[in-house]
Structures are given as structure tokens and as C-alpha cells.
């Protein structure tokens, strides 16, 4: 398989990741959990910048574009949520929604890791070392994200998804991730590096 076809898959998964995290941002905003929403805004920004890095490098090396692949936005938000107001939900429903959202996130990242391992193998088989390294870096980021979400799930399970505790932590989480987004978007030349 030509490397460009493999890179098309890699680019497509990155763009699907942007869409996934955008939907997760909406998901947690709907639940009134602004910290978790900011966390997904950060991951959305990371995914977008990763896709840009890949396409920019490919264009610089080959003078051409990585072809687009027809994509469908990941189905994250349950259909019934579009027909109801969040004020119509109770605490048990919201606890379950937090649990389901975190599980969906972990499952998404695990399926991304499986795909990336396959992409790395195929790129290495085509002797595309540089692109294989780009995919390996993305896999490392995804594995870190999996570890992070599993830690969040563990913490949430240990407090039995206690909403007052979850809500109390949101401002600190939001501040942390808004700072990370600012850092991601700051050009290197202004960082004094």
C-alpha cells in the first residue's frame, strides 16, 4: 500500500479526533461540567495541530496534499439529549452520563491506539521512517491520554461519581486546561525558548 494511502488514514483519524473531542466538549458543557469541557477543548486543539503538522510536513516533502477521506462525526451525544433540557435531568441521570462519557472517551482512545499501531507497522513496512516516527509520537500521546482518562475514571469510581465533589473540582480543571490551550497556541518565538 502506498504511504500516501496510509497517511490518508492517519490524517482522517486525527480529523475524527477533532470531531470527537468537540462533541465531548459539548457533552460536558451540557452537563454543566466546564472543566471537563475545557479538557476536551485542549485535546481537540492538540488533534488539530497534529493533523496540521502531518499535512504541512507531507506538503513540504512532496509538494502535494494528503487526500481527504469521507468522514462522519463520531456519534457521542445520545440522540434523546437533543430533545430535552438539562434542567429536566436528575442527579442519578447526570452521574450515569459522566460515567458513560468517560467510558466513551477511554474506548475512543483505545481504538485509536490500535489503529495507530497498525499504521506504524504498515509505514515501517514501506520504509517510511519519518512518517512512522510521526505516528509513533501520536501513539505516545494517545497512550498518555488513555492513562489520564483511566486515572480520572478510577478517581470518579472511588467517589462513586459524587456530583458535588465533581462540580467542586471543575474550576481548577478548567483553569488548568485553558492555560494548556494558551501554551499550545503560543508561538515558540514568544516563549523565550
Provide a role label for each language-model segment.
Residues 1-193:
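Iron-associated oxidoreductase/ferritin-like identity signal
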Amino acid at each position: 500500500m502506498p504511504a500516501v494511502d496510509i497517511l490518508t488514514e492517519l490524517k482522517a483519524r486525527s480529523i475524527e479526533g477533532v470531531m470527537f473531542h468537540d462533541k465531548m466538549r459539548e457533552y460536558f458543557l451540557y452537563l454543566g461540567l466546564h472543566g471537563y469541557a475545557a479538557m476536551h477543548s485542549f485535546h481537540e486543539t492538540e488533534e488539530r495541530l497534529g493533523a496540521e503538522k502531518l499535512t504541512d510536513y507531507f506538503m513540504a516533502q512532496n509538494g502535494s496534499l494528503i487526500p481527504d477521506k469521507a468522514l462522519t462525526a463520531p456519534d457521542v451525544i445520545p440522540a434523546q439529549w437533543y430533545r430535552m433540557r438539562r434542567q429536566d435531568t436528575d442527579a442519578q441521570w447526570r452521574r450515569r452520563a459522566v460515567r458513560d462519557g468517560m467510558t466513551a472517551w477511554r474506548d475512543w482512545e483505545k481504538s485509536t491506539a490500535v489503529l495507530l499501531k497498525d499504521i506504524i507497522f504498515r509505514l515501517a513496512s514501506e520504509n517510511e521512517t519519518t512518517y512512522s516516527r510521526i505516528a509513533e509520537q501520536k501513539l505516545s500521546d494517545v497512550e498518555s491520554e488513555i492513562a489520564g482518562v483511566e486515572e480520572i475514571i478510577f478517581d470518579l469510581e472511588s467517589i462513586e461519581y459524587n456530583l458535588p465533589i465533581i462540580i467542586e473540582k471543575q474550576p481548577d480543571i478548567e483553569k488548568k486546561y485553558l492555560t494548556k490551550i494558551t501554551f499550545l497556541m503560543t508561538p515558540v518565538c514568544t516563549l523565550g525558548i
